[in-house]
């Protein structure tokens, strides 16, 4: 299997992703001639980056889908030994300014989630990074019900942003998706709008999928595979 080459079709991408299943991160790193970090404290994005590299993703840090020519976003999911997600899933940054006129249909959240290639990764802390296994890939698009849940949450959360009610946003808002600060530290500051329409400085906010939502995606895939 040729790694690090951009796939030309959805079928080719899925075949390559499924070929990775069963390898450890250490084995994949060896094939790509790269070093596995001793821990992920300073390399939090390493797992996602090595999977992107192996599959030939080209977006990098650009705000587009990882396989824009195929309309597919790549997401790794760290899972425990029971196959359950260990953390929420980052979707994209929230537009804190210049957000007038954005609808669900034109939102970056819908763009990112319309077609997703999920790659489960074993991530129990007791297991060394190099020994963690890559799981079977899942190519997913939201069902009608899932999209309605996402849309409802997006519209509710965006209302807080547009009305300048950032101080009222907390992790409890949203059924399947939440808004949380995105930044390595308190020095990560961006522009936003307050309730009076004035520009202020605040922490960047990002949309995240809640763990039960991604757990359901994994569970549905397993049931269909049986």
Swiss-Prot record:
The keyword Nuclease applies. Gene3D superfamilies: DNA mismatch repair MutH/Restriction endonuclease, type II. Disulfide bonds: none annotated. Keywords: Cytoplasm, DNA damage, DNA repair, Endonuclease, Hydrolase, Nuclease. Sequence-specific endonuclease that cleaves unmethylated GATC sequences. It is involved in DNA mismatch repair. HAMAP family: MutH. This is DNA mismatch repair protein MutH. The lineage of its organism: Bacteria, Pseudomonadati, Pseudomonadota, Gammaproteobacteria, Pasteurellales.
């Amino acid at each position: 299997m040729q790694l690090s080459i951009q796939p030309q079709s959805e079928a080719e991408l899925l075949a390559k992703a499924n070929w990775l299943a069963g390898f450890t991160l250490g084995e994949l790193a060896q094939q790509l001639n790269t070093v596995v970090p001793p821990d992920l404290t300073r390399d939090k994005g390493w797992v996602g980056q090595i999977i992107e590299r192996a599959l030939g993703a080209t977006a990098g840090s650009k705000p587009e889908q990882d396989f824009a020519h195929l309309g597919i976003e790549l997401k790794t999911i760290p899972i425990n030994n029971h196959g359950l997600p260990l953390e929420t899933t980052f979707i994209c940054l929230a537009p804190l300014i210049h957000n007038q006129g954005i609808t669900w249909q034109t939102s970056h959240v819908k763009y990112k989630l319309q077609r997703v290639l999920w790659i489960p990764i074993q991530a129990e802390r007791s297991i060394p990074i190099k020994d963690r296994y890559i799981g079977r890939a899942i190519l997913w698009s939201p069902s009608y019900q899932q999209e309605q849940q996402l849309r409802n949450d997006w519209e509710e959360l965006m209302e807080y942003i547009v009305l300048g009610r950032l101080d009222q946003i907390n992790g409890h808002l949203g059924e399947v998706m939440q808004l949380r600060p995105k930044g390595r530290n308190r020095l990560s500051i961006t522009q936003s709008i307050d309730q009076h329409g004035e520009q202020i400085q605040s922490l960047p906010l990002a949309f995240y999928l809640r763990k039960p939502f991604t757990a359901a995606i994994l569970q549905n895939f397993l049931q269909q595979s049986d």
